[in-house]
A protein has these predicted regions:
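Short hydrophobic alpha-helices and adjacent helix-cap/hinge residues
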Residues: 2-272
Length: 272
């Protein structure tokens, strides 16, 4: 990880925890010394590098501030399960666990957790402040966030600078193949990329991946013209339901394809 990536992560987590502490103090009163209870709701499963970084970062920041907080951590595991029946069961579990002892603040990471909270908040976590992180396309939530006691840190990635670097390293590039899965996060990333390239002043042909299996994706990449590059965004679940961690995905694509691959997140680097 570069020093710039580390600094950005530190700033993001510090900002996130500062928002949490501020909201908790406003919500409970500065004179109340009772330890605050914080629920951390993750969109994905324990073991994903991004999820582990977020959770450990939250714990580390609260340890560093010396704030006396009780932290509960939950995982939606939405890369593996995301149907309505599953979410209804989660609702019942969380209602059982938190109805009598609700948290004072909720931190949610990534889009699926925020969507879950917006859907069930009125009946599950009424009026509890929510702080989000890792949201890819904040424009999707404009109506829901207005006057909602929900705030947070938006995830931004510099697509144009990544493409500029790619163009310098592969100056003959004419085609960019953008890889995303068809999950909520994947399609939010598509919207972000399309918005970013509107202002990109280099003439490139952008191709967006289909709803493919991993083998179909490899075949798509290998069929690209030689003057192409891959912009790897998020591909954690393929058309057949197979789930991929970041290391496994980048290793597979680098070994089985012959097109240069670029990414906007540091956890892809060094794995292929």
């Amino acid at each position: 990880m570069s020093i710039y990536a580390r600094l950005l992560k530190l700033i993001t987590l510090s900002t996130l925890c500062s928002l949490i502490i501020l909201l908790a103090n406003i919500n409970m009163g500065y004179c109340n010394k009772t330890p605050k209870t914080i629920l951390v709701l993750n969109s994905y499963h324990y073991g994903m590098q991004w999820v582990n970084n977020v959770v450990s970062g939250i714990y580390n920041e609260f340890d560093a501030t010396g704030d006396d907080a009780i932290i509960h951590t939950e995982y939606l595991d939405s890369k593996n399960y995301s149907d309505d029946n599953y979410y209804n069961m989660l609702y019942n579990v969380y209602q059982y666990k938190y109805q009598q002892s609700p948290p004072d603040i909720i931190i949610c990471s990534d889009d699926n957790a925020l969507r879950f909270l917006i859907k069930y908040r009125n009946s599950l976590f009424t009026n509890i402040p929510i702080v989000f992180c890792g949201i890819n396309n904040i424009d999707s939530y404009k109506n829901e966030l207005e006057n909602s006691n929900i705030t947070g840190v938006v995830e931004n990635f510099d697509i144009n600078s990544t493409l500029m670097i790619a163009k310098k390293m592969q100056p003959t590039t004419k085609h960019v193949f953008v890889v995303n899965d068809f999950s909520i996060t994947g399609q939010e990333n598509v919207a972000v990329v399309k918005k970013a390239i509107k202002n990109f002043n280099i003439n490139l042909d952008f191709i967006f991946s289909k709803n493919s299996s991993i083998n179909e994706l490899v075949a798509e990449i290998n069929s690209l013209p030689s003057d192409s590059i891959v912009l790897l965004m998020s591909f954690n679940k393929d058309r057949l339901g197979e789930v991929f961690g970041y290391r496994r995905l980048s290793n597979k694509l680098s070994k089985e394809t012959n097109i240069p691959i670029y990414g906007v997140w540091d956890f892809y680097v060094g794995n292929g």
